[in-house]
């Protein structure tokens, strides 16, 4: 489960933008959005498996902001997921600044698609040095390797994160760090290490169904049936139509 942004989607500001967008679509009325708002909406639809809706949000982004790098990168990733590699390369040529951070991640991802992991790793190493081991960069790399199911490389960057960050206090304040590490530990069958981060998140976002579901699954993996049932019951109490519980 990739729930890197799932807690952000609980934010009232995002919900307001989403409601405005969906009202525009339903009522066929024009509205203006910043590029970041529309890209977040596309990310939300992607997380929900609504890929056509995500593409429509990116279509509007590129209509309003035709040179926006993040929107172009999103479109390229969408084409890659559809195995339309040639079309993805054509869109990539529209990006003015290929040294942009997101473009470097895209280059690495395209190399990973071709099993050229060592070349992707070199891009990441240079990027991390350029950005002086910035936490968000390390988290992005961990998430990238987790998504690609590259446990060894993801683990090396988790070690790097722990070596360069205050991991005693940072998880208490950095929601994104908790989500990325949870995703890593859950993906690679280390549920006991994911559970503390899930509990921290649920203390802050007690109505996050995705995190209650994941907590239940982690307890199930450890045969902790009472705790699993309790977590899944919380998810059902929030939404009794929650099919993952």
Language-model segments: residues:
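Helix-start (N-cap) detector for alpha-helical repeat units in TPR-like alpha-solenoids
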Residues: 34-35, 69-70, 100-104, 134-136, ...
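Register position in tetratricopeptide repeats
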Residues: 47, 81, 113, 147, ...
């Amino acid at each position: 489960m990739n729930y890197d942004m799932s807690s952000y989607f609980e934010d009232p500001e995002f919900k307001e933008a989403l409601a405005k967008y969906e009202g525009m679509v339903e009522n066929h009325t024009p509205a203006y959005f910043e590029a970041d708002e529309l890209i977040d909406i596309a990310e939300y639809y992607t997380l929900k498996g609504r890929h056509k809706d995500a593409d429509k949000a990116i279509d509007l982004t590129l209509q309003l902001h035709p040179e926006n790098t993040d929107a172009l990168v999103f479109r390229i990733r969408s084409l890659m997921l559809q195995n339309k590699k040639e079309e993805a390369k054509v869109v990539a040529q529209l990006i003015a600044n290929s040294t942009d951070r997101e473009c470097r991640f895209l280059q690495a991802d395209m190399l990973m698609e071709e099993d050229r992991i060592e070349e992707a790793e070199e891009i990441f190493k240079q990027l991390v040095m350029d950005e002086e081991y910035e936490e968000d960069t390390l988290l992005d790399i961990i998430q990238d390797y987790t998504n690609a199911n590259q446990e060894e490389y993801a683990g090396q960057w988790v070690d790097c994160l722990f070596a360069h960050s205050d991991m005693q206090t940072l998880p208490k304040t950095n929601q994104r760090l908790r989500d990325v590490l949870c995703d890593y530990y859950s993906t690679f069958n280390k549920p006991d290490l994911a559970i503390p981060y899930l509990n921290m998140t649920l203390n802050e976002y007690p109505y996050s169904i995705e995190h209650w579901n994941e907590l239940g699954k982690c307890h199930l993996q450890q045969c902790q049936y009472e705790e699993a049932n309790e977590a899944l019951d919380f998810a059902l109490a929030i939404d009794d139509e929650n099919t993952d519980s």
